[in-house]
């Protein structure tokens, strides 16, 4: 079990393995920076060696049994675990609050690798609804397509789908980055509060509907804009950031980012209580 580091008497929440949030307005939430992340541990975390690798066949296991076995392997110091025969099971790899390389050889069902912090996961097949929901930090890569609500309520980390994703991708996201190599469905970025979404292909109707903050970049066609979603000028820093992200994500590094459209919140929802009745109707 890892020792807790950098604990402060001023923060009992740290000793309980909780994140400290600095709130600015309703949208700005900082959990920890990259330097703090190296020294951050949840209570009960395991010291794992990424070079220590093993395989786990879950063909005849239910999800709770498989997740418990993953926890047991981490307790033995395994830092890289290859999951064989996931066969579209729901809720595999959820709730992992530990640094770990997790490779799924196949497809996942609903809620795969949800509520994780510090996990690096790769899924060679497809994923169902709500993959990586509430991701706090880490990296999740889906090699094929993803279902609806991809990355719902994520707060940090990188979530990558090399194929296409369903409706409501990034719904209620509060941080982090979602990268889609193909198309995205309707209501992408619905009610997003912070973070960034990159879609290289087309997006469906009501893009960014009711978004409060955050940024969406689209390389293809847009079905329609949602309420309070507006276009903004693409800056040189935006282009540099997009190039870096696509390179790290290993998705179409030669994509011409200068042709991408940038969508942000029009900020009407920030001042909703001060709007006239006719303006309120147009803001929601």
Q: Model segments located where?
A:
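Intrinsically disordered, low-complexity terminal regions
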Residues: 1-85, 91-92, 193-200, 204-284
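Feature marks extracellular polysaccharide-active and adherence modules
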Residues: 84-86, 95, 105-107, 114-115, ...
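Extracellular/lumenal glycan-associated surfaces
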Residues: 98-107, 119-120, 138, 157-158, ...
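Acidic, glycine-rich active-site loops and adjacent beta-strand->loop/helix elements
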Residues: 146, 165, 184
